[in-house]
Amino acid sequence: MKLKFTKMHGLGNDFIVIDAVNQQISLSPEQLRRLADRHLGVGCDQILLIEKAEGDADFRYRIFNADGGEVEQCGNGARCFVRYVHDHGMTDKQQVRIETLSGVVIPELEADGEVTVNMGVPKFDPVEIPFIAEQRAPTYSLSLDDRQVEISSVSMGNPHAVQVVSDLDNAPVLTEGPVIEKHSRFPQRVNAGYMQVVDPHHIRLRVYERGAGETLACGTGACAAAVAGIQRGLLESPVRVSFSTGDLFIRWEGENQPVWMTGPAVAVFDGEIELQF
């Protein structure tokens, strides 16, 4: 079976985007892993499937990590999604309603080509994240082997654990991130974020993503970090979130309000691959 796809990225967080509306798609976890493999397949952080909506949305949006596991949400992917459906003539709407496992998100294509996404209302209740804790708190102490780390925990449709660090370049993202990702207090695993506060409207961020490892950028991670910082009184909206590859801009007006994320979405190339595995 030949599979048509488009390679895209949002600040280097890269995706294989597949139109499953106009071509029949049935991919096994093994096929997903092979497609995402940077040596044996196309290579990406996540695979995005565009499907027909089941409800009153315009499209259904499915996200698979490089390990083949399906996840609830991906902010950078949502921006690439709306860019794809516009570029391929699948809609002419500036504002698109997209079904995800975590609910409906509403990306909007801006006049300058950037994409703004209503990422929904963040969740702080440990049961909803999910995170094992007796009650909601601004920060929690997490035991890692012989030490404790202070985290904020929030769901942006997927779970995040955010730490504040003084030196982002030397933060233990690659060594500590995998430990936090699989910590027993996060039943569905977690994305581990490390943020350095530059000023009340600017942070630098690195994220070790659940099922993908450290990525060059993470949209839901940017939202979670900004929200956690605002909750703790460290930040004020709007927040510029800087990754090594560029910036996202996050707006959040407080409790029970949606988070808005603005950033780029870039198409790299179109391709076709024979699925012989």
Swiss-Prot record:
Residue positions binding substrate: 13, 46, 65, 75-76, 158, 191, 209-210, 219-220
Associated pathway: Amino-acid biosynthesis; L-lysine biosynthesis via DAP pathway; DL-2,6-diaminopimelate from LL-2,6-diaminopimelate: step 1/1
Taxonomic path: Bacteria, Pseudomonadati, Pseudomonadota, Betaproteobacteria, Nitrosomonadales
Subunit structure as annotated in this protein's UniProt entry: Homodimer.
Catalytic residues in the record: 74, 218
Site (Could be important to modulate the pK values of the two catalytic cysteine residues): 160, 209
GO cellular component entries: cytosol
This protein's name: Diaminopimelate epimerase
HAMAP family in the record: DAP_epimerase (MF_00197)
Species this protein is from: Nitrosospira multiformis (strain ATCC 25196 / NCIMB 11849 / C 71)
